[in-house]
Amino acid sequence: MSLDGVWAPQTANIGDGPAKKASDQASMQTQVLQTASLKDGPAKRAVWVRRDNAETEDPVKSTMSKDRPRLEVTKAVVVDLGTGFCKCGFAGLPKPTHKISTTVGKPYMETAKTGDNRKETFVGHELFNPDIHLKLVNPLRHGIIVDWDTVQDIWEYLFRQEMKIAPEEHAVLVSDPPLSPHTNREKYAEMLFETFNTPAMHIAYQSRLSMYSYGRTSGLVVEVGHGVSYVVPIYEGYPLPSITGRLDYAGSDLTTYLMNLMNNSGKHFSEDHLGIVEDIKTRCCFVALDPIEEKKIPAPEHEIHYTLPDGKEIRLGQERFLCSEMFFKPSLIKSMQLGLHTQTVSCLNKCDIALKRDLMGNILLCGGSTMLRGFPNRLQKELSSMCPNDTPQVNVLPERDTAVWTGGSILASLQGFQPLWVHRLEYEEHGPFFLYRRCF
């Protein structure tokens, strides 16, 4: 299977004619990866990890016995835990092979069984159990983990039920969102090493992984996911947190706003129907290039029909494009934060002149919410309008909804990355702070 489309992605430049190959950009070398090149490609799919107490190839000085079992080759697992979905698969593949909802089910007290062996968390396909009344909960809030016990249940399901692997036999690469607390990384290490006994792990900056999926080492990553949005400047592999922008609105807010618009037009949806509204959003909604002109189009031309699960048919009109205006006018959802385009320009203006010029031409769009039809073109129009003396360039990939995972797949496959794995023996010997020597 050819992976050329992943390792040398065809990146479409909005408003700039034919797509350009991302690999034609400047040198693919980054200080973070030392000699690692994104052109190393899929040949480096197997990862050296210690089995049991095996030593790393470039070991940290240890007081323990030097008699180690030999290294064995195994495939690394890449996991991207988002607010909406958790995506996972083996490093070296172009797309994640497994994707489940991050929302889990907790039995209501009246339906929960008594005894110590009762199941407390239902994950993935277990949610479709008609015999148990479940309360849906999400262990993440705006991209940040708030319930680690539930996250552990999700990972247990991913490893054992979805991928059907023994986690103690595979290195694991995890994505970490921008501006997350440092304790996130330490908790990940504790869970992976002490609960799942993984032989090695690495935690990578989420926006950096998104950038790698484009084949770049510098760029302005504009990421709009399910629970939070970010605008992250990255230079030669290094994120710039001091000028990173975070917006606490994203795809879930779009779903809620769409539901409110439909209810205002006479339909009857509640929070119990959010799954249906999510499907309506994905199938029927779009982003208008010019909402004022779009409103002038006769209403019947906007109408389409959507069939509900019970067979009933509803008609959708202008709410199909009005809902997405919240990204550019957050006051519509009672948010005091900047619009996505304004936040993007704000981050660019905080950069020095040389860096700003580089980032202007490398605006990289990522996240599932950017998959709405018309989203890239609208953002391009807004940025060009706000920066008439510059040439902002929005770049898009067809698979940008899985950009974080794909970047992790690329990174974990690079030969030059292999010394950056944190091994269990090193964690046991030096503690969680050893993470910061390899994960930065």
Swiss-Prot record:
Record has tRNA processing as a keyword: no
One family name in Pfam for this protein: Actin
CC per GO annotation: acrosomal vesicle; cytoplasm; cytoskeleton; Golgi apparatus; male germ cell nucleus; motile cilium; nucleus; protein-containing complex
Places the protein is found: Cytoplasm, Cytoskeleton; Golgi apparatus; Cytoplasm; Nucleus
Tissue expression summary: Detected in testis. Detected at the acrosome of round spermatids (at protein level). Detected in adult and embryonic testis. Detected in developing male germ cells.
Assembly information from the UniProt record: Interacts (via N-terminus) with TES (via LIM domain 2). Heterodimer with TES; the heterodimer interacts with ENAH to form a heterotrimer. Interacts with ACTL9. Interacts with CYLC1; the interaction may be relevant for proper acrosome attachment to the nuclear envelope.
Stated name of the protein: Actin-like protein 7A
